[in-house]
Amino acid sequence: MPRPIHASISLAALAHNLDVVRRHLDQAAQAAGGAPPSIWAVIKANAYGHGIEAAVAGFSAAQGLAMLDLAEAVRCREAGWGGPILLLEGFFQPADLDLIDRYHLSATVHTREQLDMLAQARLSRRVDIMLKLNSGMNRLGFDPDAYGSAHARALQLREQGVVGAVGRMTHFACADGTPGVAGQLRVFQSVTQGLADGPVSVCNSAATLRYPEIAVAHGAQAHWVRPGICLYGASPFADADAASFGLRPAMSLRSQIIGVQDLPAGAEVGYGATFRAERPMRVGVVACGYADGYPRHAGTGTPVVVGGVRTRLVGRVSMDMLMVDLDPVPAAGIGTPVSLWGQDGPSVDEVAQAAGTIGYELLCALAPRVPVKRDS
């Protein structure tokens, strides 16, 4: 018999979250008197741990998909996705352009070397590109003083039949908090003002939820947003949970109690004996540890749901197991279901906060050894 741990991926929750984002953007567009943007559903890192094929099915109503990895883009095509696909880091060597050509992909361009590779490529069709501006995050993109010349070269490649649409994009560093997006948005608008029309994309999850008005399209200008984490039912914000936006968790990590210990007062639990029972208590052993993707740094007090009752983790997380306080669940015993996070448990963001990290990391870190079930 396999260990009693598995992750469930809800396709209905994925579709619901996409619809929540779409309605949010529709309302912003109506208020601003413009048109709502199109949505690139971001499915990088194996769809934030949820699986590429599940994401293709769950996000079937999106206008496009965005990711980093060429192999994942190919999997999308093999899963039946026929719409636009954007490679968020573009390409790294000339051979990548052969796959981009074959599978009809679009690419982010953020270096002169990528423009050089495009100029030397022999492709069967034009490649749509998004020219990225470094507006202040200082990660990827052309600096403001180099962007104009890079854009001009992209237009030359378009005239030569190599490039199709030439879009403009940037990435916000602080859309989830202070100082927000105003400074970077000013840089983006100043640098790109007057450049030839093409699609524009500036909003990630946080900006899409908090500043949807900046993605509203006016006139013939096409806008795209790039929501990621919110589509999986987790929050990009430290000060607002996903449920407050109407989002539902798409991944649920579940296991069972596999052992019970009746402890006297003063007994210690787990590696390092970091937890000591203040009174006689029952402790349950759960088949889940850091080798399954549960955060090792989650300490005593991290929320867990056992048999439908909220309780707490006690002691250190082991490689394959963790321990929970069963006093709030007197009927619990071996075989009692446990929800580590998800639809019937604490939110992944709660667990992440207790471990000093973010929900993104936990979702992406689900271990390959954990069986995954897809729910419709």
UniProtKB/Swiss-Prot annotation:
Query: In the UniProt entry, which residues are flagged as the active site?
Result: K44 (proton acceptor), Y271 (proton acceptor)
Keyword terms? Isomerase, Pyridoxal phosphate
User: Which cofactors are required for activity?
Assistant: pyridoxal 5'-phosphate
Alphabetized SUPFAM superfamilies for the sequence = Alanine racemase C-terminal domain-like (SSF50621), PLP-binding barrel (SSF51419)
What EC identifiers does the entry list?
5.1.1.1
Question: Which residues does the record list as N6-(pyridoxal phosphate)lysine (modified residue)?
Answer: K44
Q: Which InterPro entries match?
A: Ala_racemase (IPR000821), Ala_racemase/Decarboxylase_C (IPR009006), Ala_racemase_C (IPR011079), Ala_racemase_N (IPR001608), Ala_racemase_pyridoxalP-BS (IPR020622), PLP-binding_barrel (IPR029066)
Gene3D superfamilies in UniProt: Alanine racemase (3.20.20.10), Lyase, Ornithine Decarboxylase, Chain A, domain 1 (2.40.37.10)
Entry GO CC: cytosol
Q: Does the keyword Thylakoid apply?
A: no
Pfam families reported for this sequence: Ala_racemase_C, Ala_racemase_N
Q: PROSITE patterns this protein is in? A: ALANINE_RACEMASE (PS00395)
Per its record, the protein catalyses:
L-alanine = D-alanine
Which terms in the Gene Ontology molecular function aspect does this entry carry? alanine racemase activity; pyridoxal phosphate binding
List the GO biological process terms.
Answer: D-alanine biosynthetic process
Q: Where does substrate bind?
A: R139, M319
Which top EC class is given? isomerase
Pathway(s) where this gene product acts: Amino-acid biosynthesis; D-alanine biosynthesis; D-alanine from L-alanine: step 1/1
Q: Which family does it belong to?
A: Belongs to the alanine racemase family.
Report the function annotation for this chain: Catalyzes the interconversion of L-alanine and D-alanine. May also act on other amino acids.
Name listed for the protein in its UniProt record: Alanine racemase
Which species is this UniProt entry from? Bordetella petrii (strain ATCC BAA-461 / DSM 12804 / CCUG 43448)
Gene that specifies this protein:
alr
